Amino acid sequence: EERPYGRTTNLQTLFRPPGGRFVGEMDLHWDADRLAFTMPDETGWHVYELTLDAQGHPAAPARRLTPQVEDADHFDPCYTSDGGLVFASTANMTAVPCWHGKQKACSLYRIGPDGSVRQLCFDQDLDLHPSVLADGQVVYSRWDYSGTMHMYLRPLMAMNPDGTGQRAIFGSNAYWPNAAYFPRQVPGEPGRVAAVVCGYHGVNRMGELVVLDVDGSGKVPAGLLHRFPGRSVSSLDDVRDNLVDNSWPKFLHPQPLSSRYVLVSAQVAGNAPWGIYLADMFGNLVPVWVEADRDCFEPIPLRRTPRPPAPTDRVQPHRTDALV
């Protein structure tokens, strides 16, 4: 098949959802033999898994991993290094205050290696975009709807896969950025993650592509290492609600290859399609796959990667008291 910009490649469909259903929010296992993703069925939104063979071809039909819970949706999965899976769910039955309960909120849950399901987060509002850091902890975005300045309270959090040790690692007690979404560990560089920063209202979870230091104090501006493409760290005095509405290009779904190169979904202008690009810190935004009549999202290199260590599970479900 002819690829844009004069090169050729072989495209392969790994999975075609029945009935044209949505399929996305993908996470590839470190062994590259399993792909978890979100897809709806007749009962709601669920997490599914596709098994892959050594050549990256589907080895079996996709199977559903999450249980059916009345009036609840499950989505946004990530594998954990201890053999479990973390995902978001509306089974907590909470809602966003400013919508007077009409819009559901979600918390993070865990499927253990034994198949058991347990709630990890008990926040008032949304916990989103879990992924795994180099030390095996889970990083995610949390929205704290509290106080008069809640439009600036969406820090990056980290916790152990069992839900213990929850703490803010970037953006706490700061006015910039309003939010950081889609955090992903930079390979081979512990303490650094790629993410998309954006405002509170305005465009939805799309914005500027950055690399952050989450091993230090988590403070701004010291924690901001780079903004792409090719933009060095500059003044962060632009504190406002609709932070990135007029910022181009806009980014989604970063997959860092290093702190200098990030495979990412990008829209270069308001009338342009979303495509797959390679962004680098030298100012380049190289198109990898762009089609005029459709949008392309969520690039993931289909390859094996080193598995992080598995933190010790410290939860004791049989206890009837709390241990602090």
Located regions from the model:
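Blade/loop signatures of beta-propeller domains
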Residues: 1-9, 97, 105
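Multi-bladed beta-propeller domains
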Residues: 5-22, 51-73, 112-125, 160-179, ...
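Conserved beta-propeller blade repeats
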Residues: 20-29, 34-35, 71-84, 124-139, ...
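Residue position within the beta-strands of beta-propeller blades
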Residues: 34-38, 49, 85-90, 138-143, ...
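Structural motif
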Residues: 43-49, 95-99, 103-107, 148-157, ...
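Solenoidal tandem-repeat scaffolds enriched in leucines and small polar residues
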Residues: 68-169, 173
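Loop/turn-rich, solvent-exposed surfaces of beta-rich toroidal or solenoidal domains
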Residues: 141, 182-278
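Surface beta-strand/loop "capping" patches
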Residues: 303-324
